Design a protein with these regions (language model features):
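Amphipathic alpha-helical packing segments from all-alpha helical-bundle domains
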Residues: 93, 102, 106-108, 116-142, ...
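Amphipathic alpha-helical linker/stalk segments
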Residues: 56-87, 93-95, 99, 103, ...
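Short, structured helix-loop boundary elements
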Residues: 9-10, 30, 52, 56, ...
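Basic, helix-initiating cap at the start of DNA-binding domains
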Residues: 1-39, 47-53
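Short loop-to-helix capping motifs
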Residues: 50, 113-115
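Hydrophobic/aromatic-rich alpha-helical bundle segments in the mid-to-C-terminal region
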Residues: 119, 141-174
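Short amphipathic alpha-helical interaction/hinge segments
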Residues: 62, 66-70, 99, 115, ...
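Key DNA-contact positions within bacterial/archaeal DNA-binding proteins
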Residues: 42
């Protein structure tokens, strides 16, 4: 896509994200998004074949951005404890923000009808986080800073320990 088309696509994704977050997936129409955009449904369909495809693109974009932000400013060669503490604080604070929680609720509600939305969420969010954290763990194991272990299991256990029940309580509003 030319740069102008890239900018237009990004604008569509930003506006669609806002509308989906306010109204949820089921209550959002392409007409409502087009109205907020100041364009036509035809413009939306030039970029996305369906509301589901548009929502999938919103989910992928939001998750990729969130996953990347979790690894900003991680001390590259610092003490393992320092890096894990930093990551734990960031993941806990970012995943408990209202936006990510709201997005997860929408995804959970729609995944049964549209499994590709759940897959897009998993691949661009949780899987990316798992892969990057596993890479950190593998490097620490190789450098002798962490006991021999399966880095994927260690990463999953660490993430789950950090989030514990707090994430579930926030997600379910209790």
């Amino acid at each position: 896509l030319p740069k102008r088309d890239d900018r237009r696509r990004e604008t569509i994704l930003e506006i669609a994200r806002d509308v989906f977050m306010m109204q949820g997936f089921a209550a959002t129409s392409m007409s409502a998004i087009a109205t907020r955009l100041g364009g036509s449904k035809g413009t939306l369909y030039n970029y996305f074949k369906s509301k589901e495809e548009l929502f999938g693109a919103v989910v992928s974009r939001e998750c990729a951005g969130l996953a990347a932000s979790l690894f900003e400013n991680v001390p590259p060669d610092g003490e393992m404890r320092q890096r894990l503490t930093h990551f734990g604080r960031v993941i806990l604070s970012r995943l408990l923000e209202d936006g990510p929680i709201r997005l997860q609720r929408i995804i959970v509600a729609e995944t049964e009808r549209f499994p590709e939305i759940g897959a897009a969420f998993y691949e661009s969010g949780p899987r990316q986080i798992q892969d990057r954290l596993s890479a950190y763990m593998a490097a620490d194991i190789a450098a002798g800073r962490l006991s021999e272990a399966d880095p994927r299991i260690a990463a999953a256990q660490f993430k789950d320990l950090v989030l514990s029940n707090i994430h579930q309580q926030k997600l379910w509003g209790v």
